[in-house]
Amino acid sequence: MTEMNTAPQLAPRERCTGCAACCNGCPKGAIRMVPDREGFLYPQVTDGCVQCGHCTHICPVLKQREPRTEPAAFIVWNGDEAVRRNSTAGGAFSALAEYVLEGGGVVFGAALDSGLRVSHIAVKNRHDLPQLRGSKPVQSDVGESYQQVRLYLDQGRQVLFSGTPCQVDGLYRYLGEHPERLITCDVACSGVGSPGVWEKFVRSMAYIKQQKPLSVDFRGKLNGESTRRFHVTFENGGQYDAPLLRSEVGRGLARGMFLRPACHTCGYTSTDRTGDLTLCDMTGGAITPEEKRLGVSLLLINTAKGAQVFDSLPLHRRRCSLAEAVAADRALRSPTPVSVDRSRFFDALEQEPFRQVCARFLSALQPREAAGKPLKELLGNVRLPFGKRKQK
């Protein structure tokens, strides 16, 4: 059966994850990713399209993947106490990335650039690895990362690709296979925030402080505390620090105010994962108060390759049941509900000053929200890969 003369069919807008497999895979380069009014990237077909149908063929939304066997679940933490102490969770991502780099491989993951925009980059040495560490709950622009992954694989190098489950699925669809030298790690994600809204936050912080924000830690811990904090460092040494739940960014993420529409019906919120390994949150239940304070990660082993890599990592580990894992991380069982105010929020963004919109929709949490366990649970799961925080 040929793909010729097949009209280009892309995922319905409300289901499109923005994985960019179609854009990377178009043999004519006739698809580009364009931001919409909410700041999310969507594929746009240009006049260069020859209607080969390849984009339809590789779209993860339009072509369902085969289910996998039930994963094994482990509570893990890095054997290096310094790394663990300065990590968002247990330092598992650091161990995995260093394992690949030490073997001469390349690590792909989400990073913040000088303008605090989130995009996927390739890291080839330990010196640059901190760029990939830490939580980034804003949707990452994968750019041409899938093409770069193929290039490094063709050169015979091992590659680790980390990202949301839809990005990992998009990579596999683009490649059309599961190469032996490719290791994938998806994160149990509760949704990705709007890059457009995040850009407005960055501009707002710069205006209020009258100085450029240089770095952001979305889910930091101070002095080994388990409370997640939103921390910003500015160019003249000024800082902003608050519990994530008390920051406008955290409130918006927790309320599902500016997540990508497809996230609210996400088909990846289950234990049937796309990566060889899955990083999840483990903040209660099967862990002790001391483990919660120091930080541990929940790791799912989804494939034989994932098990082989896991056995090589310098991680302390303890087996837990899959039921405990699902109970610990909401992203393994259901999508994030959409806010009833979401449409009004984005309508207001087009008509009113940003600070005015924040005051109306992202003000202090209502008592029922502040006390609700589901909200706290959600805040623990909105992220990209775990990892080491930069020391202050």
Language-model regions, residue ranges each:
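Immediate flanking context of iron-sulfur cluster ligation sites
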Residues: T6-C16, L41, T46-V50, G156-V159, ...
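Flanking helices and flexible, charged tails adjoining ferredoxin-like Fe-S electron-transfer domains
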Residues: M1-T6, G48-Q155, S321, A325-D341, ...
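Gly/Ser/Thr-rich loops at beta-strand to alpha-helix junctions
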Residues: T88-G91, S114, F161-L171, G191-G193
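A short alpha->loop->secondary-structure connector
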Residues: D128, G176-A188
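Long, compositionally biased charged/polar accessory segments in the mid-to-C-terminal portions
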Residues: G103-V106, Q211-K392
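Short, flexible loop segments at boundaries between secondary-structure elements
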Residues: I183-S204
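Local cysteine-cluster metal-coordination motifs and their immediate loop/turn environment
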Residues: E14-G29, V50-L62, T164-G170, L259-T271
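Iron-sulfur cluster-binding cysteine motifs and their immediate structural context
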Residues: E3, P8, P12-R15, A21-Q44, ...
